[in-house]
Amino acid sequence: MKEEILIKFGNKIRQERLKQNLSQEAFADKIGIHRTYIGMIERAEKNITLLNIKKLADGLGISVSDFMKLE
């Protein structure tokens, strides 16, 4: 069973990425993470590190604290 926080986090990434009209591939290239890894995060299949959370937030142009406000 997937953890709820991972689901919310993945949804937040997808939502913010789509707001910027970025494909998974374009976003992955922008931040230096493999496209399949982005997909796994968005599908709540990965529990990622703080360093990668920072990369995601920076790539989306938002602060880590705002990024972590999960609803």
Locate each region found by the language model:
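Short alpha-helical DNA-recognition segment
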Residues: 21-40
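Hydrophobic micro-packing sites on short alpha-helices
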Residues: 53-57, 67-68
